[in-house]
């Protein structure tokens, strides 16, 4: 990541913290219980926008991509989704809907690569999600998003 890109990333993280942290507090749900709320059944596959629907991760299983995705996850995603991806991060506590449980071995395989790319790119501040998940598509390259998808896939296996 270059200088200007790093500045935008830091600014985005600060902005996300400013939005998410005030919403933190004791939650009514256990961590990760909102996977279905965060990813409504009707959202996959029919509601995935056409430009994302048929995408397939070109970096699937690539150890270098997984390692890079792990680093990006630690800095961008773990505050809400938790260090292991269980939806139990400190910034996600008390948020409605709670961050999705990326370790759910029953649910995650049902989500297409295109769906994950879409959610990372566009975030979740729209129907049917209405979540606080930020849109990372303006800060991350296509490759960086695929690296995240590659790493996220390892969390439920």
Question: Predicted segments — roles?
Answer:
Residues 2-11:
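Bacterial N-terminal signal peptides that target proteins for export
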Residues 36-72:
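Electrostatic cytochrome c docking/interface patches
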Residues 60, 64-67, 93, 107, ...:
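Residues at secondary-structure transition points
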Residues 25-39:
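Bacterial Sec signal peptide processing site at the extreme N-terminus
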Residues 96-152:
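Extracytoplasmic electron-transfer domains, predominantly the class I c-type cytochrome c fold
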Residues 21-23:
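C-terminal motif of bacterial Sec signal peptides marking the signal peptidase cleavage site
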């Amino acid at each position: 990541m270059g200088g200007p890109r790093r500045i935008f990333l830091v600014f985005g993280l600060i902005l996300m913290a400013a939005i998410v942290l005030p919403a933190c507090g004791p939650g009514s749900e256990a961590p990760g219980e909102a996977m279905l709320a965060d990813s409504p059944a009707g959202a996959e596959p029919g509601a995935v926008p056409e430009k994302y629907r048929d995408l397939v991760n070109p970096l699937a299983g690539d150890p270098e991509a997984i390692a890079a995705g792990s680093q990006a996850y630690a800095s961008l995603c773990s505050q809400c989704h938790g260090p292991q991806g269980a939806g139990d991060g400190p910034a996600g506590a008390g948020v409605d809907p709670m961050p999705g449980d990326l370790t759910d071995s029953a649910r995650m395989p049902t989500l297409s690569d295109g769906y994950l790319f879409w959610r990372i790119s566009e975030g979740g501040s729209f129907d049917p999600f209405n979540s606080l998940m930020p849109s990372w598509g303006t800060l991350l390259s296509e490759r960086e998003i695929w690296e995240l998808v590659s790493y996220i896939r390892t969390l439920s296996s």
